[in-house]
């Protein structure tokens, strides 16, 4: 059957991407979408509704709460014979060979590479782009956007790489200047 509802399960930075993703999915496709913190989902799951797509979002593919919540959702839905309640899952991750990759058949591999810093900048942005693409695809399938509007949305995505390159280049120059200016300073308040 057709997807009538979307549940997104995530933790941390992935949950923030999921919150933006839920907005995009609802705005573009018109499908009601809810975001759940994975640990809360496990202990207070929403009522089972038919034709629900569950999306698990985890940068590493190993986030324990997200994996446990997805596993619980698979078991809950598999215990019902009505096909409208069957598990319908997608995972968005940076590691398709991870635990979530083995757990979920449909994987969106964000291909962001290794995240060096603590702040998940590359993976966060890649998750946002994944949600944007998913929202466009659902809008196309549902017919909620005209072909012209879909084309405009895709063209806006195509414009992003050179804009980001310019932004990073400007940021690198200002960062280098700040580092040079503060290099010999011992204390900062």
Predicted regions and their residues:
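Glycine-rich phosphate-binding loops that contact phosphosugars or nucleotide phosphates
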Residues: 4-159
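Cofactor-pocket helix-loop regions in the catalytic cores of large enzyme subunits
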Residues: 1-4, 8-13, 155-189
């Amino acid at each position: 059957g057709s997807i009538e509802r979307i549940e997104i399960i995530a933790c941390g930075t992935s949950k923030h991407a999921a919150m933006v993703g839920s907005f995009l999915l609802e705005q573009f496709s018109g499908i009601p979408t809810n975001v759940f913190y994975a640990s809360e989902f496990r202990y207070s799951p929403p009522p089972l509704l038919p034709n629900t797509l569950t999306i698990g979002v985890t940068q590493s593919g190993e986030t324990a709460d997200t994996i446990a919540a997805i596993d619980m959702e698979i078991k809950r839905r598999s215990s019902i014979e009505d096909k409208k309640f069957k598990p319908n899952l997608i995972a968005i991750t940076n590691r398709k060979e991870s635990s979530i990759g083995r757990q979920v058949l449909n994987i969106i591999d964000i291909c962001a590479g290794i995240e060096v810093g603590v702040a998940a900048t590359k993976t966060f942005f890649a998750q946002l782009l994944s949600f944007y693409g998913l929202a466009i695809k659902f809008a196309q399938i549902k017919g909620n956007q005209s072909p012209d509007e879909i084309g405009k949305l895709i063209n806006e995505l195509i414009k992003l790489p050179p804009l980001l390159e310019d932004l990073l280049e400007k940021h690198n120059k200002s960062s280098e200047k700040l580092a040079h200016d503060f290099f010999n300073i011992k204390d900062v308040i």
